[in-house]
């Protein structure tokens, strides 16, 4: 007792707080001194003491203890101000979305961090014993980050994927959150709850895979005799002492350690805490230690390479299953990685760059030759310096020198005046932050619809040569030129051409769907469209453009053209007087069937149409039937329209059928099957018998439907009809059945003696009397056809915008081609057309134009740009016009000169249609200019309507001197109605001449006129340039491919024109097609407000089509073609950028898994690949080819192993989980132990592409005395599990059938060396006690001598087995330069004795 007391008296009294590390050290020293039992007793006392003190202190937390920080208000305000400026820059197109996101994250992150520092200071000054303050630094639960959320601001949140939400939460939990902030907060909170569940299962699966990889690794030998080691230096200070000691303790030395001449530790000695501390104190040379990496065995490990057992502190026992222990040691904390998510609750943590600030006010000077301009990652202009840059700041008499380190950004210009503490440079964060970075793709979507346009050359990525993915070689803007578009695939042709002024009413349509009445096809069919003309007589306002369902075509040419679809086999057929246009229905287009229907235009041979003559017809496929039957249209009167003039008109047209015009809305079709058989054929069914489907009727005929059979014998043939339907035997009281051949509408009650029921559909009742006088009634189904009024052929012929006289009208009439009650026969498989839709020509007969009696029509063929188009021209003819002046070859002469005197030539651009278009519909109720755009995507082109809301006119040639009253009023209200001004797009009067003029000179004159405008020479007002193109800033003109239409709409009243004199105030030279950014100063009167493209240059004003710029930096991928039409929400650009991952827990487990499964290269920094390439070149240059392979592979493997261990350790350490390196090393050794055979020099042993173990490859090379070419490969843990020596182990992991089948085919042998194979087969597992028997069996094979004939390939040059270590200098230099991310380096170099 006295001895103990005396010892106590000698003990030193430590007065300092004990944290977790100190407790650990204390416990280990206690165990060393007193042993286990006594230590546990002491620890119990310590625990009791702790609980007593905590009870006595009784820290409680009240809401009053949460003190908010006074400076928060202005800090947040400042950050908001910065964000606002940033938003403006983005809007102007100065920064792109990624730069904006990055900067806004950094602004808020910095604010939040600053608040956090303020919080600590604030507490220390105001209330150092505040319980919140005490708790946050106690190290128990809660940390500054959480307290900061309570009293500072929550800041930026991560979403479930670890990405940033760029809307910060400005409130803290004490103040309370707004609704938006609450919802964003829920992301982080949700992660804590959900992850706990989900990630636990993930961690379990990770453990399973890890154990699978290493289950066969058992300690089987004491020493493998390796001479290699991994060298660790305690001197370089890169590693914290704690981690250094943790790396060392329990390892075995691979070499003697000398201190001067004195040996302080010998090879194969294990390192305890005393020795480790001695190494640190002496700062000895690099220490070479043995690790599982250096063990020479392939499928097991030796005691010395493994080191001490973690359980009892001695060298590991033979037969210990260290593989399984390693797998569980790494997998098990995975659950901890997950369960700790609630630490920061999803709050984002990242890093910001360091800044260099100016020491005082003054002018800054530096050498401009040493810097070159660059964009920072926030999109700001800056200078990058490659070497140390010396900057002088000169105030009145003091000169300050500042050195800026290399690779920094200089944020000021030369000779600029800087203020004290202004940020002048930004130091790039060092290489160690790379570990938290990853490559991310960010898609930018367009905010508005319009055409895409870019202002620089773009390249095709090699793998996307034929698609619409382009890579940008330099920074440039992408513009979306606005225009609202209409997308429709309903009607496949239109009659408008580029630049036409058109009345959009002619395209205004509604979609209507009518369900298909046919039984077998219940798809919804589109009715093409019913016109949306509303000007009926009831409205009382006669509007010529909305005449009731008629289309005025006046004197202008009505032009038709060939239509080409995406399937080019649908060509219009042209005969002498007939023109057939193929036409695809929706279903056909979806199924890509050949078209079945067409629109035919027939012209009388003499080319003259009279009034009411049929001009075109269309056979609608929905009125087409395969089966025979009878049409009925009720008792409503029917009259024929076949009159005399029609007979004259059809002179020479061969097929002429009577056509019946129905006044009814619907008609009925009663189907029946008809078979016409030769008289001699023998029937297999009786008359009036009832048969089922597919019954044999005659020799080669089977019935297609079931029903009642009626046979009629006629001259030389027999007619056999099958009526489907129900047979009904009427009672005496049944009155309905007395009638025959009647139609009964739905809802009529059909009575019977036994049952009475309502009829659901229309039925047809037919009375049938067989020979035995007993009659019965056949109830037959009826198909109803609703004839929709006016199928939309009329919408193909747009109304004329300008001509009001001599209106030519087209009436749509539906004819039923068969009379009521007449049987219709279908011959074999041809289908029967029941209804034909015709267009009947008509024109007004008012007083003025009473003389018009006929219209001339002709087909005209015009070849433009190598495309041949067929046009149809119709002109109304007055009798007093003579035809004498026609020239044969003159294209303009083939048409009579009409009354208004302007001779329109055939090249007149009114309503022609380019080939390859589809009919689009526009839903805008206004007029516009149509424009054809490039659109490679032929499937669904679109109309673009460029309405006045998308354009604005501004006047750059403003002079302050010329202000007058009107100018002032314009300033107050900039919208002047278009009617008061003859602006470039308001010139409806000049349109006739103008069209002719521009269309003949497509592009040539415009360039000249534009340059003249831009220099403002005296050109006349009438010289309008309305040709619309996509022109880029380099002055190239793109002539758009005529693949889609767009409508530029100039006639609304909200364009504004500012008219006054131009003078010398004109600064910017404006050229056509130029793009103008927002707030660009074009004239003295200040910046102009919107961004856009100049489409019209006037003498005193310009018209700008509004456009939105998007900035794109080099390496970005552009989706879409130049001039393609994009809709809102389409992907525009994809940026690939490096971004910091949030350091939150959620990243822990996936990160470990990503490293172990060797997933994508995203997480590898961009510089690393370059470093590896450089290293390879350097090696092969020094050593030559064969050595290069060997050493390259060897080093790559060593290097990747060290790097993987560091990465995994980093994740675990960041979570406070401590795992001994050797566990990770065992796993990593397994996933890096294979190489890939690269060339077939060894074809007699290994095939190229085969995976073999590294050691096996080396041994085979030595034995065969040949060099094997192989490269290192990293297998993920899953692949490594499926590439083992044992197929039983593989099959029990996953893909069982595949593994077993392959093993059977290859005749694989399983030597049952691992644990799992033996467990599966019920044998004794070769670990622990079962290990002894295994060893005894293998001893006898040990001493067989191996004889080699020749000297080894390697021995000639280097005697030692491991040649690479003779290149020690090369090795160290390369490694130190190239291969290391020196963050927390556990190992440096690579050593051999």
Swiss-Prot record:
Keyword list (alphabetical) reads:
Chloroplast, DNA-directed RNA polymerase, Metal-binding, Nucleotidyltransferase, Plastid, Transcription, Transferase, Zinc
Compartments in which it is found: Plastid, Chloroplast
Q: Does the keyword Membrane apply?
A: no
Q: Which residues cross the membrane?
A: none
Which family does the record claim for this protein?
Belongs to the RNA polymerase beta' chain family. RpoC2 subfamily.
Task: Identify the PANTHER family for this entry.
Answer: DNA-DIRECTED RNA POLYMERASE SUBUNIT BETA
The subunit field of the Swiss-Prot or TrEMBL record says: In plastids the minimal PEP RNA polymerase catalytic core is composed of four subunits: alpha, beta, beta', and beta''. When a (nuclear-encoded) sigma factor is associated with the core the holoenzyme is formed, which can initiate transcription.
Q: What is this protein called?
A: DNA-directed RNA polymerase subunit beta''
